[in-house]
C-alpha cells in the first residue's frame, strides 16, 4: 500500500509526509 504524501502524490512504499 502507499502512504507517502510528502509531495502530494500517493507513492507506493509507505513513509511520512504532509501533502494532498
Swiss-Prot record:
GO terms for biological process: N-acetylneuraminate metabolic process. It is found in: Nucleus. GO terms for molecular function: N-acylneuraminate cytidylyltransferase activity. Its EC number is 2.7.7.43. Coiled coil: none annotated. Its cofactor is Mg(2+). Keywords: Magnesium, Nucleotidyltransferase, Nucleus, Transferase. Mg(2+). Other divalent cations are less effective. Its main location: nucleus. May play an important role in the regulation of sialic acid metabolism. This is Putative N-acylneuraminate cytidylyltransferase. The lineage of its organism: Eukaryota, Metazoa, Chordata, Craniata, Vertebrata.
